[in-house]
Amino acid sequence: MGGWLIMGIYGLIQQFIERIQTLHHLLPLLPEERVYIRFECENENVIFAISKNGTEEEKTVDEKRLLTIRGSEEAIETLLTGELKLQQQMRLEELSVAGSFRHMLLLESIFHLAKPYRFVR
């Protein structure tokens, strides 16, 4: 960990978005309609949308299709770099998630399949 924090959560989210866009095996998993993901931590609040039509940062959201992930910068970093899974961090109470269970499972799958190769086990 540690070294990633220099980049900040925003930079890690940008890298995650780029991975989603370049990993073509993820396309069948992506929803037809946009699903919005909000990351909230002490210093940052970033929202982006994922769908088959693309993945990008957003300013406005459809609250019914929003999944909010809250936690410390370190916990969000651990999720975005693939060191721990979303549900593992929820059990450890490092992250909390608000939104539909279906969207949470979808995002858990995308995080797992899009994690950087150095963390693939």
Predicted features and spans:
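Feature captures hydrophobic
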Residues: 2-121
